[in-house]
Amino acid sequence: MTDLSQHTPMMQQYWKLKNQHLDQLMFYRMGDFYEIFYEDAKKAAKLLDITLTARGQSAGQSIPMCGIPYHAAEGYLAKLVKLGESVVICEQIGDPATSKGPVDRQVVRIITPGTISDEALLDERRDNLIAAVLGDERLFGLAVLDITSGNFSVLEIKGWENLLAELERINPVELLIPDDWPQGLPAEKRRGARRRAPWDFERDSAHKSLCQQFSTQDLKGFGCETLTLAIGAAGCLLGYAKETQRTALPHLRSLRHERLDDTVILDAASRRNLELDTNLSGGRDNTLQSVMDRCQTAMGTRLLTRWLNRPLRDLSILQARQTSITCFLERYRFENLQPQLKEIGDIERILARIGLRNARPRDLARLRDALSALPELQQAMTDLDAPHLQQLAQTASTYPELADLLQRAINDNPPAVIRDGGVLKTGYDAELDELQSLSENAGQFLIDLEAREKARTGLSHLKVGYNRVHGYFIELPSKQAEQAPADYIRRQTLKGAERFITPELKEFEDKALSAKSRALAREKMLYETLLEDLIGHLAPLQDTAAALAELDVLSNLAERALNLDLNCPRFVAEPCMRIEQGRHPVVEQVLSTPFVANDLALDDSTRMLIITGPNMGGKSTYMRQTALIVLLAHIGSFVPAASCELSLVDRIFTRIGSSDDLAGGRSTFMVEMSETANILHNATDKSLVLMDEVGRGTSTFDGLSLAWAAAECLAQLRAYTLFATHYFELTVLPESEPLVNNVHLNATEHNERIVFLHRVLPGPASQSYGLAVAQLAGVPGKVITRAKEHLQRLETTSLPHEQPRAKPGKPAIPQQSDMFASLPHPVLDELSKIKVDDMTPRQALDLLYTLQTRL
């Protein structure tokens, strides 16, 4: 809207505010409702399933409108945020009684998916992250902020592959990118991607705003002074947070410099296939998180999720965690701590809301209870002798003065919001007590005053009353009015009665008529002062929250180690991966029968296992359990194995399962090849690689050739590789690649039924049992019978159309099959002409070497 003069004063005010937020929905406060107008109304009515109506006219046109009660706004906001919408909250700041024209309004807050802090709008078990990225194809700066905890980090990343892998790990709900980036870049395809003006990322202004935020002269103390791109991204994030919150952000106290070299990198496909915290259906059941999480606090659960999604390569941190878990297991110490931790609650997010000055009364009540529980928690930690646990216990100190302040201030069961009062205890503030007493006890005061005045004057028909026009009064019948004391001031004459006021009643009137509103204003002021007092202690309180969250995770991992029979892995300098009696931590929990544990041995003499065996035999489970054991070891956890000895890995890759990307125009085979290409380009001799059925999405010869070449490449890279395949031809790889060995998952048939034994044994499988699996799956018997006929033919001839179709029940004429019969090779011709008996051993050896170079 450009010409506002045609609009009513109310709509002029609306458009002046709306024009600053054209791409966001605006909730416009009018009395007890948030009204939504024009295109916003049409969109909101559809998204929220509420009635779209119209409100009068402005500029000659009716105004589309819908509305929601302001006291019920949270539920509607939650729905809009889940749908990825941003909402501008515009409140009345003027007094309708004194305003000339429209009541003054202003934007007090902008709610976006990445900057929400209200408890009702958040998933308590997951971080709510917003990220900003700046750079080009070679180098990117990434900044990540969790406004609900104050965690703020930066890192610089080389190349798109690493950036996309990191974005997959942090999974931000909003991603800010520069507006001058070309359209259609991979990062923009993520949900919540928003373009921001290029100057929002400008390095010098970003550096200045960050130094102001942290009250420092430079960023050297955070180790990121030279990270030009990351600083630009962090400055954009900080500006966006301030723009949406419309307040200072005292809970953002530092900037953490993260490095990819410190972590085990997992790409998007690997995270999806390993089902760390989300299963393949998008739910949370039967994930690694669901099995490993028995944390007592929501902040502990979120920290565990961060650990699972960011395994570390820092041996000192991993060993400190292992030692801590061992300490908790001694004399079952975790059992003493966990009940105490349960009393703490989610103070991490409560403190963030205090910093944002939007903490609710019940937040302060929960903080009060948490601070009151800290002394007993400290007592439970006195015998923890692991150095890391002692450090955490020291950080999680007690706050007796704050606990006492909140104990004196906040009612035991305060209301949800400060709006209607009733939050602060009687006795906390004398003036508030008096105002509340006046407001609540006015009736009793009038009864007492009437009794006292009757006794003082001797006028038995005296009455004390109130009306809205004249206020409080003392009423006497006309006959007794002449006997009124001298301090009675005439206020109103009625037929048959006179009304008076006294100095005492006038004083009470002045207090009582404004007592309620003054009490509410006083209580709100005291509440805000209380928040400011707490903000002054935010830094140590946030450190305490972080320490308690880590104590929660470590005690949880100790409990899991005991109840899931997990053992401590041992990190060694020698390159190896040796697992005895390893188990899949998730599958083991859902099976009704005992899980079959298996061994794994990879080292400098064996870097790859070619895994064969029947479908449903357990190949994928064996591979996934290896990856999960390695991942758990790299978060410092104990692992589901009798013993585990390994060296640090740098990446975990998985090429497992089949899926397409229809939206991206990629077939199942294209997705498979893209994942394979990523592995072959980025795997090193410190990487763990899981490859399952590579090449099955194309023709037999193409697929086999690709699988063979990929396996050879990985063997030469010396990556720790588990390569599952149904191409039996690959089992000859150990003959040419000395670092490759064969293993298989065994099965047996009994009464024409397959029995899976799930045991990993040396050597290749003898058969695949494909028809037996099909029969087990319920494929009709006649189809199985016909398949057996085709199988007999295919086992004795290269292609089915090369032989006439046999009559039912009669197999085709047996012939020796050769998978490569249709691919003649000149070396084969030359071999067929060699007269072996006429050659010396030396000549034969030389010829073999020559022929080998031609293969």
From Swiss-Prot:
**SUPFAM superfamilies for the chain:** DNA repair protein MutS, domain I, DNA repair protein MutS, domain II, DNA repair protein MutS, domain III, P-loop containing nucleoside triphosphate hydrolases
Q: Which UniProt keywords apply?
A: ATP-binding, DNA damage, DNA repair, DNA-binding, Nucleotide-binding
Positions annotated to bind ATP? G613, P614, N615, M616, G617, G618, K619, S620
PROSITE patterns, from UniProt?
DNA_MISMATCH_REPAIR_2
One Gene Ontology molecular-function label: ATP binding
Query: What Pfam family does this protein match (any one)?
Result: MutS_I
- SMART domains xrefs: MUTSac, MUTSd
BP terms from Gene Ontology: mismatch repair
GO cellular component term of the entry, any: cytosol
Q: Which residues cross the membrane?
A: none
Read off the InterPro entries from this record: DNA_mismatch_repair_MutS, DNA_mismatch_repair_MutS-lik_N, DNA_mismatch_repair_MutS/MSH, DNA_mismatch_repair_MutS_C, DNA_mismatch_repair_MutS_clamp, DNA_mismatch_repair_MutS_core, DNA_mismatch_repair_MutS_N, DNA_mismatch_repair_MutS_sf
Does this entry carry the keyword ATP-binding? yes
Name the segments for region: Disordered: 796-817
What start and end residues bound the annotated signal peptide?
A: none
As for what it does, the entry says: This protein is involved in the repair of mismatches in DNA. It is possible that it carries out the mismatch recognition step. This protein has a weak ATPase activity.
Family membership, please give it.
Belongs to the DNA mismatch repair MutS family.
Q: What is this protein called?
A: DNA mismatch repair protein MutS
Provide the species name. Pseudomonas syringae pv. tomato (strain ATCC BAA-871 / DC3000)
Q: Lineage of this protein's species?
A: Bacteria, Pseudomonadati, Pseudomonadota, Gammaproteobacteria, Pseudomonadales
Q: Which gene encodes it?
A: mutS
